[in-house]
């Protein structure tokens, strides 16, 4: 069984900016131990003759060729807009200069 110390849990909590109680620290240590023990099962998997791969299925993206096509006229695109300005959509401000 992999032993996770109290200090390791506190360090992880600190990195995640979490404040946890001593009881939660103990519970997290036990939970992490269980997770690590479960993950160790991969060490005993027979991978002889198995090629390394990033995906379990031999699939690849099927993409269409990029082709430039004529878009819709500007007037039509802006036809149902609530507000326009200089030939563009005008939307409410969501950030002020202080946020930028």
Curated annotation (Swiss-Prot):
EC number: 6.3.5.-
Sorted UniProt keywords: ATP-binding, Ligase, Nucleotide-binding, Protein biosynthesis
Molecular function (Gene Ontology), one example: ATP binding
Pfam families referenced in this protein's UniProt entry, alphabetically: GatC
Reaction catalyzed: L-glutamyl-tRNA(Gln) + L-glutamine + ATP + H2O = L-glutaminyl-tRNA(Gln) + L-glutamate + ADP + phosphate + H(+); L-aspartyl-tRNA(Asn) + L-glutamine + ATP + H2O = L-asparaginyl-tRNA(Asn) + L-glutamate + ADP + phosphate + 2 H(+)
Record-linked InterPro entries: Asp/Glu-ADT_sf_sub_c, GatC
Gene3D superfamilies given in the database record: Glu-tRNAGln amidotransferase C subunit, N-terminal domain
GO biological process: glutaminyl-tRNAGln biosynthesis via transamidation; regulation of translational fidelity; translation
Residue stretches in coiled coil: none
NCBIfam families: gatC
Family: Belongs to the GatC family.
Its job: Allows the formation of correctly charged Asn-tRNA(Asn) or Gln-tRNA(Gln) through the transamidation of misacylated Asp-tRNA(Asn) or Glu-tRNA(Gln) in organisms which lack either or both of asparaginyl-tRNA or glutaminyl-tRNA synthetases. The reaction takes place in the presence of glutamine and ATP through an activated phospho-Asp-tRNA(Asn) or phospho-Glu-tRNA(Gln).
Quaternary assembly: Heterotrimer of A, B and C subunits.
PANTHER family listed in its UniProt record: GLUTAMYL-TRNA(GLN) AMIDOTRANSFERASE SUBUNIT C, MITOCHONDRIAL (PTHR15004:SF0)
Protein name as annotated: Aspartyl/glutamyl-tRNA(Asn/Gln) amidotransferase subunit C
Organism of origin: Staphylococcus aureus (strain Mu50 / ATCC 700699)
Gene: gatC
